Amino acid sequence: MAHLSLLGLITVGAGGIKSCVNVMGAQQMHPDEHKELITNFFTYFFASINLGAIIGGIVTPILLQQINFTTSFVFILACFVLATVVFVFGDYMNRYVKAKPQGSAVLQICKVVVYSFARCSVEKNKESQEGKFKDDFIEDAKVFFHLLPLLALVIPFNMVCANMTTAFLTQAFKMDRNTFGWTMPAALMRNVDPIAVVVISVLLDRLLYPCLRRHSKMPSVLVRFFIGTLLGALALLCALIVEYVIMAHPLFTVSIWWQVPQFVSIAAGEIFLISTSYEVAFTHAPPELKAVASAVNLCFMAIANSLSAAVFQAASPWLPNFDFEEPEESMVGSHYDYYYYFLIGLSLVGAICCLLMIPFYRRVYAAAIIRQKSGVPPVECR
């Protein structure tokens, strides 16, 4: 029971900080004068998350194996304390641009949804039409609602990402993990993803994006979504090829390093899609709803993880657990290739949806620009 309580605290803490920290970081830049820097910020923001994953994914297991369980958690606690001290010190030095508290925008949005269903109209909730909400807030809410289909496009790709700890891990168990005389833990391959994210982020920010901007070829938001989703499909294709190679050879003979391309492809896709989704939630949402949009973006990622778990469970007849004591027998009836085919198809459907949504995105973007240029001050949420 104590463990469940602690997991609940992690959930509350992560949910509270994740939806706000990226918004606060982006608010340190001027929306017009630093427009290009906002894209750079979200690229490096996502890279910094993965830098933490690298440190945690490598140092923590070593401390756990070489010292003890307590030391591994004390290390993480020390990192949290250091981050908190640095953050508070920055506030003490007046280094932050801080938006004024405006009440619970989440509660207000929920009320708008309920009243809109009750009255079968969003417009009828305006005070000018005898509704309960200020006209400006309803206009902002409409812009926010139009963002939801765009943010939902992250679901197929995040379902692919979830397989790094399921199907990809099982695949690694069946491979030769000998690395210069050391039997590498299969789960350690997961660290290829954050390492690749950090490296590719720097390459994109320093080389590719500046070159594209100079030639006025910087891809739009949904084109980046499209590229990211295609890279997810490419990762699955790489995993499928590796799976067929494993099936064609005796177990434990194919090197685990053949998994690197699929992890690198996912890493590149994460930068194009996930970091861009953070950017969309911030730049396209009205001022008082940016944190709400960020939270909804994270909710869609959580939905993707839940759907991935459900699909994995539904496909369990194809995906038997790998048994090290009876490896050959556990492979009988295994069809991870079918599972990969399904996910590749899902990714391609998601990529096509990204392209089909481009006209809708242009209307949403135009509406967001109009709201931002109208000079309407943030509406206080009561």
Model regions: which residues?
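Hydrophobic transmembrane alpha-helices of multi-pass solute transporters/permeases
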Residues: M1-R382
